[in-house]
Amino acid sequence: MKQFLFLYLSLCSVCLSYSQEGLRQLLNDSALKHASVGIQVTDLNTGKTIVSHDPQKSLTPASITKVITSATALELLGSEYRYVTQVTLDESDPTRILVLGSGDPTLGSDVFGDNTTAFFINITDALKKELQPDREYSIYVVDNLFGYDGISPEWTWIDIGNYYASGSYGISIFDNTYKLFFNTSAKIAPPRILRTEPDMKKIRFTNFLTLNTTGSDNGYIYGIPFSYERTVKGNIPAGKAEFSIKGDIPDPGLFLGETLADYLVRSGIKISQVETARTDYLAKKQVQYKPGKIVHTLTSRPMKDIVQEVNVKSNNHYAEHLLRIIGRTQNTDIYSDALQAGIDYVKKFWEQQGISTSSLTLHDGSGLAPQNAFSPAFLTEILAYMYTKSKNSKVFFDSLPKAGKDGTLRSFMRNTKYEGKISAKSGSIGGVQCYSGYLIDGNKQYAFTVMINKFNGTRSQVRSAIEKFLLSL
């Protein structure tokens, strides 16, 4: 027995020495010479630290913020939670069609391989059975669940207007995203605009795009929510008959209503007006409507599927909606700030689980805000809780991409001993590279967070340095 104990302790000592050497090499890597580095690796079986470096330092996290958002959503709402969007007739005005938004980010989404237009086809078929072809009808889209501050005030101008920074509202459609197509075959700048998909009839583009010969996509669309003026800058590849970049739909609720109107008109139903609740909301006007007969109900996929999309594909749009629905469940007043209520609940919930949030500064649910900050120790504690205490442990673990296999980790740790054995979320914005998740290899069961800010090397050099460190564990 004593010999076995001695052997076990000796092996542990060897493992720790390897980890410490791996940490030393990471910190001395030339790509990180001027960087801020925070690391925490915790043994999930014992709760003890395997290796750490400045674990309490608050650093910019980028998309590993989604670990917090997705974990909190699962704990509050459950893995089977579903958004429900209803189309009803208005009892107080029989000529008014109501679309009642629930904050579902998946309406018309192509993420899950569904027919993106099925929502409109099914509603049209259902309404044709209820409406009279000789009467005129209006559409009122109730999209005010989260209010109309759809983006974080801490997002940067370079992001606003692009698809990955789309607004979050009570109604979404087509991932709140459109494609803008160009013809660059003439190799003359600015390239000719061909079309948008879906057809964004109202948007006016000011085109400052130039062309490159590298084949890289550096095109960006700038513009604020609810404005139809968009500026296009940057550069895109020359010599293409068609090339597209993506932007955010300025007013998703109105676009959904107008698209539904087009479907109804083509089916023989007369539509005289399309409105959203925005004007009435901003005027604090109490609109009298009474949902009557439910004509169509659309139920989203369960939360477990949505969370997996958030973490595997790093879907900002879904993550932002999750944080706001968290907030709205805590404060049902539609004039309260759903984003701030969500942030407040995140802090409250994790404090209740005995995890200090003193290092946490949160401005969104996706990690796009560069002012977000928290410590590696904080996030690793959440990971440990989700693995050892949460009833959603398996759902959460399965939502994280596998190293060398899928999602944002497809090329990370590929062809190494830990391929498929690390399940983690990556995070990267300018000068930031982070990884947070689990290493499960037999009896070796670790939660880890690696956060690197303001590195001077290339991103590939930093990723390689992190891979070498993880291989030392």
Regions found by a protein language model. Give the residues of each.
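A short glycine/serine-rich beta->alpha loop
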Residues: 54-59, 246, 368-369
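Beta-lactamase-like hydrolase cores
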Residues: 18-58, 77, 121-133
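Short glycine-rich loop/turn motifs
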Residues: 36-39, 307, 319, 433-436
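Short active-site loop at a secondary-structure junction
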Residues: 52-68, 72, 76, 80
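Small-residue-rich helix-loop
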Residues: 50-52, 313, 323-473
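Conserved serine DD-peptidase/penicillin-binding transpeptidase domain
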Residues: 26-27, 76-357
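Bacterial Sec-dependent N-terminal signal peptides
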Residues: 1-22
